[in-house]
């Protein structure tokens, strides 16, 4: 039985993926911020066909201390993890800083999956890492001297940059840990509660455009495909849309930038820079 850890599992793409993965017979460990929501999705996944007890984990992934605690709990329970789905993410209207000193978008969307993946690396040997990226990465510009967006803040640009980080992380993870299958995907523009923290253009667009957006179930297909399919087992370091490999932006294919981001992220997360080499 394939064990899949899903972060951001309580709504949208994560919830839809969890239910479909359970329907296909996967064992699940679900991660979310709200214990009641985690419990509710676990029950829905179990009803969809989950054959094994579903692990329920509560963590605020904007805090690296909670990422570390989550990793410890997962390591204590599971000797092997077949798939880690780094799905948790959000967009924030204004710049906020976590108690640990990180800009909120960067912490949740990039640093948390970077740290969690590295802390679980030995449990993932031979497995898959699937990260939810976005075509919004094309609007992002990564400045290694301003990872915390202190010079200026635009919600969509900062979100796009965090998704660019996801692709660069995936690319560098594939290079450093070739025994893994690390890939990321664009889910499309999905009808979810995503962007509810934004009071600007994204909130307007989601209100007007919602009838034309994809369902969470449609948006989750590439996640499920990358997690379980035989075809995806042949991929490493790729960016996928609609279950096919596509080419990301020029900056997303910059190997030197990917290496530099990895080293800076390891430093910020308190990891050795040679982790996963």
Regions found by a protein language model. Give the residues of each.
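Rossmann-fold NAD(P)H-dependent dehydrogenase/reductase core
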Residues: 1-193, 268-276
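C-terminal amphipathic/interface module of NAD(P)-dependent oxidoreductases
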Residues: 251-277
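Metal-centered catalytic cores of metalloenzymes
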Residues: 188, 199, 250
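A short, mixed-charge helix-start or loop-turn motif at secondary-structure junctions
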Residues: 7, 151, 155, 205-209, ...
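A glycine/serine/threonine-rich, flexible loop-to-helix segment
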Residues: 191-207
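A generic structural signal for short coil/turn motifs at secondary-structure boundaries
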Residues: 92-94, 248-251
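Short, flexible, mixed-charge acidic loops at enzyme active sites
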Residues: 142-147, 197-200, 239-240
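C-terminal helical subdomain
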Residues: 162, 184, 206-246, 253-259, ...
